[in-house]
């Protein structure tokens, strides 16, 4: 297995299964999306009023969108949240890890925004997601 995120297919499957169990406890109603990008599929959790201002949430390294669960109940009252599983991290997005020194992540994020139909949005990021 050549996967820059996990040491084995078994580890990848185990983490994905545990993550799905955690997502079952997402604190508000949600929609799970799979957005095609040039880096592969990107997993996004959308929640909050569909007509509310959009906010894109980008977690840090060695994390996934579950990191936002404590914040979601409050923020989703006034905003349409899009919690994006960053590529190359232990979530449900493509297990690719492009070089951080290039423009691959910026182009990937452009693809995500286009796939979500967002021409503008506010961003909240932590660690790696804060660029």
Feature roles, as predicted:
Residues 33, 57, 94, 98:
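Generic anion/oxyanion-binding catalytic loop in active/binding sites
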Residues 83-128:
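Active-site loop/oxyanion-hole signature of alpha/beta-hydrolase fold enzymes
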Residues 1-54, 78-79, 118-119:
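Alpha/beta-hydrolase fold catalytic core
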Residues 30, 40-42, 65, 81-84, ...:
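Generic alpha-helical hydrophobic packing signal
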Residues 17-21, 67-70, 104-111, 131:
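Alpha-helical elements of Rossmann-like donor-binding domains used by nucleotide-donor carbohydrate transfer enzymes
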Residues 15, 43-91:
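Conserved HGGG/HGGXW glycine-rich cap/lid loop of the alpha/beta-hydrolase fold
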């Amino acid at each position: 297995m050549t996967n820059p995120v996990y040491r084995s297919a078994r580890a990848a499957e185990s983490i994905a299964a545990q993550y799905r169990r955690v997502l079952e406890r997402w604190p508000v109603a949600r929609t799970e999306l799979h957005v095609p990008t040039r880096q592969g599929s990107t997993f996004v959790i959308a929640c909050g009023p569909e007509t509310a201002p959009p906010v894109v949430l980008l977690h840090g390294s060695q994390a996934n969108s579950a990191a936002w669960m404590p914040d979601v109940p409050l923020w989703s009252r006034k905003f349409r949240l899009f919690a994006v599983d960053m590529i190359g991290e232990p979530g449900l997005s493509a297990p690719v890890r492009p070089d951080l020194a290039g423009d691959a992540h910026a182009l990937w994020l452009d693809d995500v925004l286009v796939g979500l139909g967002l021409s503008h949005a506010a961003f909240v990021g932590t660690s790696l997601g804060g660029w």
